[in-house]
Amino acid sequence: MEQKPSTLDPLSEPEDTRWLDGKRKRKSSQCLVKSSMSGYIPSYLDKDEQCVVCGDKATGYHYRCITCEGCKGFFRRTIQKNLHPTYSCKYDGCCVIDKITRNQCQLCRFKKCISVGMAMDLVLDDSKRVAKRKLIEENRERRRKEEMIKSLQHRPSPSAEEWELIHVVTEAHRSTNAQGSHWKQKRKFLPEDIGQSPMASMPDGDKVDLEAFSEFTKIITPAITRVVDFAKKLPMFSELPCEDQIILLKGCCMEIMSLRAAVRYDPESETLTLSGEMAVKREQLKNGGLGVVSDAIFDLGKSLSAFNLDDTEVALLQAVLLMSSDRTGLICVDKIEKCQETYLLAFEHYINYRKHNIPHFWPKLLMKVTDLRMIGACHASRFLHMKVECPTELFPPLFLEVFEDQEV
C-alpha cells in the first residue's frame, strides 16, 4: 500500500503553496532592498520626521516645507505642467490626506500642499531649472579652481639649502651642455642623402647606414665626456667610491644623452639636435644604428616639448637619472638612494615654485624618468647588435668603454 507523504514534511507541500511562499519571500526581499536604498536624509531633520502633507517619512525641506519625496515630486509636476485646474474631488474636497490615501485624490492633496505652505513660486520651469543647474555647475567648478589654487599655494618651495643644491646642479648642466640656448642657431643638418641607404643588415631586421653611423660616432665621444663632467661637478657624486661612480655613469650615460637630445626636438623641421650641433631626422637616426631606440627618443622629444622645461628641470632630471640606486654591482646603495631622494625633493619643490599650468605636472614628469630608463635598456641590447654588424674600427674607445658589459 502506497504511503501518503506527511503534511509536516516541507518537501511534500502542495506546489501552489510553495509558489505562493516563494512569491512572498521575493516580495519581502524587495521591500528590504527598497528600504535599504532610502535616500539621503539631511542632518537638520529630526529622526523619523514626518511629511507635513501626508505623514510619510520626510526627506528634506522642499518648496518651503518639510515633505517626503512623493509629495515633493507631486507638487513640482503639478505646477510645472499646470495640472491643478484639471484636478477634481468626488467628495467635495473633504478627503483626509495621509500616506495611504494621498494617491486617491489629487485635488485634496494639492490643496493640502498649499495649506501647509508649499510655495508655487519656488517651482522652476525647464529653462530656469537648466539655468539653475548650470549655475550650480559653475559654482562647483569655481570652488574646485579655488581649492586647487589654495593647494598650490600651500605646496612648499625649495628651502635655502635646496636652492643652493639646485644652483650647483643647474650650473653643472649649463657648463657641460653643448651650445647652451644657442643650439638652434649653431646646429647643422645632416645631409638628407646620409642615413637613407642602409648597407649592413641587422639581426632584428633593421639595417645600418654605415656612413650615418660613422657621422654619429664623431660626436659621441665629446657627448659622453660632457655627461662625465656633469656628474663630477655634483658634490654627492664625487663623494662616492670610484667603483660606484663608474657603474652609475655607465648606467645613465645613454639616458642623459637621450634626454639632452629630446629637449632639443624641433617640431618644425622634425629633427633632434645631437650633442648641440647635429640635427637629424627620425629615419637617419634609426638607420644610423639606433633602430627602434630612435623612435623612442623622438617620441620622448615630442611629448617633452609640451612641458616647456627650463635648464634647471633638465639638470635635476639628469641628477635623478645619475643617482639610480638599482644599478647592478653598486656598493653604497643606501647612500646613493638618499642622494636621489634629496634631488627628488628639491626637484618637486622647484616644480611647485615654477607653477606649471599642466595638470599633475610632477607625476607626469616622473613618468619620463621611466621612459628614459627604458631607452637606456633598449640601447644596451641594441649595442650588442651594432658590435656584431659594424666594423670595430668605427667604434670610438670611450664609446666601447662605456657601453660594453652593460646589463641587458
UniProtKB/Swiss-Prot annotation:
Name of the protein described by the UniProt record: Thyroid hormone receptor alpha
Positions of modified residues (Phosphoserine): 12, 28
Residues where Zn(2+) 2 binds: 89, 95, 105, 108
PROSITE patterns membership: NR_LBD, NUCLEAR_REC_DBD_1, NUCLEAR_REC_DBD_2
A single MF term (Gene Ontology): protein domain specific binding
Zinc finger (NR C4-type): 51-71, 89-113
Disulfide-linked positions: none
Source organism of this protein record: Gallus gallus
Annotated DNA-binding residue span(s): 51-125
Role played: Nuclear hormone receptor that can act as a repressor or activator of transcription. High affinity receptor for thyroid hormones, including triiodothyronine and thyroxine.
Record gene name: THRA
